[in-house]
Amino acid sequence: MTDNKNHSLISDIKSQIKKFSEKALTLEVGNVISLGDGIVLVDGLDNVMLNEIVRFENGVEGMALNLEEDAVGVVLLGDYSNIKEGDRVYRTKRIVEVPVGDVMLGRVVDALGKAVDNKGNIVANKFSVIEKIAPGVMDRKSVHQPLETGILSIDAMFPIGKGQRELIIGDRQTGKTTIAIDAIINQKGRNVNCVYVAIGQKNSTIANVVRELEAHGAMEYTTVVTANASELPALQYIAPFTGVTIAEEWMHQGKDVLIVYDDLSKHAIAYRTLSLLLRRPPGREAYPGDVFYLHSRLLERACKLKDELGAGSITALPIIETQAGDISAYIPTNVISITDGQIFMMTSLFNAGQRPAIDAGQSVSRVGSAAQIKSVKQTGASLKLELANYRELEAFSQFGSDLDDETKRILKLGKAVMAVIKQAPNKPYNQTDEAIILFTVKEKLIPQVPVERIQDFKEYLLNYFKGTKLRADLEDKKAFDKENTPAFRCAIQKAINSFLNNSQDFKPCEEAEQTAFDKFFNENESIVVDGENDFNFINEEVSLKPTTETSEAVQIEEKVQDFVEPQEILETNKMEENHIFEEVEPEKIICEHHEFEIAENQEKIEGQQVLEDTNHEYSIYETVEQSGEVDNDESKDDDLEVLVPVAEIEHDEAILDERENRNWVFSDSAVSEVEKQTIMISISSNEAEQLFDNAKSVVFFKVTPKYPVEKVLVYVTSPVQKVVGEFDLLKIDVNSVNTSWNKYRSSSVISSRKEYLEYFNSHKEAHALLASKVYKYRKPKDLASFNMNKGPSGFTYLK
């Protein structure tokens, strides 16, 4: 029995000896010589690679960045509080790599690709090293597709193509990040993945960016890589390489990617910090000699691949922060020479309220024009020239008042162009809309619109063309040709006339233009228009008593001939308001709960017109003047007018001093359900005179501010923006446009019905702000001294 056991044991030993391999597992180990400021000197790692990950005894990792003869300089990628001299350091024989693929979409990660958004760990099937050689010359294709930013001035003057590197440069607080975020938001639905790399930013700033992207649904196709200001310099150094590595994976899959580096100035500072701590010799501005190579190898990885490699692209928007507008500093000049153009943000323009504050003179796009669609290229080509002429003459015009007509024309056009390219954040345009807006500049039509109304006119113009065959033709052709150009010229002239409600100054279209215009609109085109204006005469001036409950939402569907213009609708409303009735075809009125037809047989009884519905007990009684004519200047509905107390004018010097010398600032928490707020509104100088000098107590606005409101600060918009006074708010009354005018016209700061209708053109409701006591400042205050954010339709909420 014992012999059998021994025999079995010997057999097992022999079997193990046969399987023995002579290969030995080698483990390279070094020791910590010194450490400090996130840098560790290690000896004993003679075969370590550049950018290789090394691991310390406590599990913290570092990256070998300096390979010297007697030691290795390692930058730490984690907490080094527990590392001490003499600790062992192990090679891992792998380069820094991060997870890539669609699993990264919608995530916020650190410089090592680890999730920091509290949405769980990232489970990736593929990893990629962060340092790669950029695609070669023969692997690339020229830029030929536009990347739409949705920002009018950029798409028109400095277009960006897919695969381009376009620098955004300027001082702090000039709107650089806003442009980049708007560009990301505008990629929604365009099959473009986005990467936003935040380098050295505050955590609160990054959180705001993420919230803004989430609010616009942009995080669905975006990855945010963050190395905030409190992170180790090594993490700030590798963050942009992590971002472009994530982007490259999608590019090689044939997808288009937009990457934003915010910003490379802080990236260069982080690299300078590491280099000085590693005892590398400093150069200009203490930057190491290879700082140019640092950014060139990063930005060269953005490109457009040729079709054989999938035709994917990476478009890079690096951001550089300048000091006092100095673009000749070391890092700005380096990055300008690497990129394919720059967008220069100007502090003076930003402070003057020009947003985006782009300096057209110093900005340029060297390759993007090849990617512009033809319609934008046709209309945007003259934009830079018009602005250059305006800038040149603007300086000279300040030295004298005697200007010739040509100079006045150029200055007027230039001011209009500056207003045209103003654009609020997160309000992108598609390129067809941009082409239509730019057409008004190219054809010199925009100066007809007052500068202060151009922002409203742009929205009006786009709504004017919305859903028309003319716009569809432009979107299909992507160009202005001999057929649609005269039609657009005629249509825009009609739109301007309609917007200004000024038919006596209307410039009729030439015969050829009118013919081209008519070609795009035929008699069979049915347009559904909003019925609020058309049926004001029913709602306000006539007794309409249905037997069953009806909805307030009423629409009219009618056959119209040619192109239905808002001006024509407005004129129809005026006729109806003034009791001018003619024989009309039966119209179908569509209500939410009821449907009825106005009876075809209309009876006239003792000077009254009766319209009866046979299915419902509706009766509409309207007095008709025997002559058939009524004064067009004013409505005769005196019954609706209410008596509003005259506003009390405050004369007490002490009270005025107290009111005038308070400091107001905008507050995110200013609008609450409990605390009463102060709002700021803008009115014309004439309206301000009526309010403060003549004690008119009603100010009209298009929208209602958030409640509750106690005080209202007032600033005038011309000739200069000045805060001229304030008033205590009695109440806010909301009615339809006609009702508000009929009720408050005698107390209104707006003196004429024509001016009132111009202001409320295309709006359903008027909001009357009633003042109880007014306080006129003796020294008007500069609007720029108020720290504020713009609210809806001129409202600013203050504390």
Curated annotation (Swiss-Prot):
UniProt xrefs under InterPro entries: ATP_synth_asu-like_sf, ATP_synth_asu_C, ATP_synth_asu_C_sf, ATP_synth_F1_a_nt-bd_dom, ATP_synth_F1_asu, ATPase_a/bsu_AS, ATPase_F1/V1/A1_a/bsu_N, ATPase_F1/V1/A1_a/bsu_N_sf
Gene3D superfamilies in UniProt: 2.40.30.20, ATP synthase alpha/beta chain, C-terminal domain (1.20.150.20), Hypothetical protein (2.30.130.30), P-loop containing nucleotide triphosphate hydrolases (3.40.50.300)
Site feature location: Required for activity: 363
GO cellular component: a single term: plasma membrane
Binding site residues for ATP: 170-177
PROSITE patterns reported in the protein's UniProt record: ATPASE_ALPHA_BETA
SUPFAM superfamilies: C-terminal domain of alpha and beta subunits of F1 ATP synthase (SSF47917), N-terminal domain of alpha and beta subunits of F1 ATP synthase (SSF50615), P-loop containing nucleoside triphosphate hydrolases (SSF52540)
Listed transmembrane segments: none
Membrane-related topology note: Peripheral membrane protein
Keyword Transmembrane: no
Region of interest: ATP synthase alpha chain: 1-549
Main location: membrane
Translocase among keywords: yes
Domain of life of the source: Bacteria
Catalytic activity as recorded in UniProt: ATP + H2O + 4 H(+)(in) = ADP + phosphate + 5 H(+)(out)
Spans annotated as Unknown: 550-799
Assembly notes: F-type ATPases have 2 components, CF(1) - the catalytic core - and CF(0) - the membrane proton channel. CF(1) has five subunits: alpha(3), beta(3), gamma(1), delta(1), epsilon(1). CF(0) has three main subunits: a(1), b(2) and c(9-12). The alpha and beta chains form an alternating ring which encloses part of the gamma chain. CF(1) is attached to CF(0) by a central stalk formed by the gamma and epsilon chains, while a peripheral stalk is formed by the delta and b chains.
Name the record gives this protein: ATP synthase subunit alpha
Biological source species: Ureaplasma parvum serovar 3 (strain ATCC 700970)
Lineage: Bacteria, Bacillati, Mycoplasmatota, Mycoplasmoidales, Mycoplasmoidaceae
Chain's gene name: atpA
